[in-house]
């Protein structure tokens, strides 16, 4: 089944969908024909890296690799306390956070997928910051002009960190670890039992960062993309 990603479609001004699961080869070909008729211009699918057969079916039907992600997990059970001032951000801080975020997430799939332009990828992260302020399940913390972290409640017991970023000039100074301490403290106070964060497999610095702070790998996934071209309708 193909599900439209309404927010993505509106932001990129092209109809974008996702495969809710990878079907058989024949079923996928039928879905792709229907997607053409329904005016989709791009489809995405995220699958476990263990599912080699599913990845092969996607590749056979024109999907290409855009991202390999590593999902890390930790229980926020310790009494984490940041050693520097980390405060909750308000909408008034949006412009500052956007400035910090520029160019920080180039390992992300939107920068490496030919369907999206560099400018679109940059603007996407800016838009995510704006939308985070309007989401009641998200809290944002920052170290003024240096870094920020977003914390999202997925359920009563599970939390996730969608974004964490530190300005290039301030990296290596403990800003990131203190932002993470604040996030874990917030999740613990909110009753979360587990916290996840996803990073790209090629971002070795980030992976060593999470490992050093006690996170462990939960699973690895692959994000595949497919452009639906006019000439094959």
Region roles according to the model:
Residues 14-23, 82-119:
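Short amphipathic alpha-helix that is part of the acyltransferase structural core
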């Amino acid at each position: 089944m193909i599900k439209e990603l309404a927010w993505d479609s509106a932001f990129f001004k092209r109809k974008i969908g996702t495969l809710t699961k990878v079907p058989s080869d024949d079923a996928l070909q039928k879905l792709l024909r229907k997607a053409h008729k329904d005016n989709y211009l791009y489809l995405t699918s995220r699958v476990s890296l263990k599912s080699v057969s599913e990845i092969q079916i996607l590749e056979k039907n024109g999907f290409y690799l855009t991202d390999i992600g590593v999902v890390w997990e930790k229980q926020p059970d310790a009494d984490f306390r940041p050693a520097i001032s980390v405060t909750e951000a308000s909408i008034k801080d949006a412009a500052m956070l956007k400035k910090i975020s520029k160019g920080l997430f180039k390992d992300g799939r939107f920068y490496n997928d030919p369907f999206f332009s560099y400018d679109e990828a940059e603007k996407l992260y800016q838009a995510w910051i704006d939308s985070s302020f309007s989401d009641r399940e998200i809290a944002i913390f920052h170290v003024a002009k240096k870094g920020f972290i977003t914390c999202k409640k997925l359920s009563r017991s599970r939390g996730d960190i969608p974004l964490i970023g530190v300005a290039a000039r301030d990296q290596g100074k403990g800003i990131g670890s203190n932002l993470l301490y604040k996030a874990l403290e917030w999740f613990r106070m909110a009753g979360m039992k587990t916290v996840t964060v996803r990073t790209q497999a090629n971002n070795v610095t980030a992976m060593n960062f999470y490992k050093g702070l006690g996170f462990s790998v939960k699973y690895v996934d692959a994000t595949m993309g497919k452009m639906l071209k006019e000439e094959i309708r």
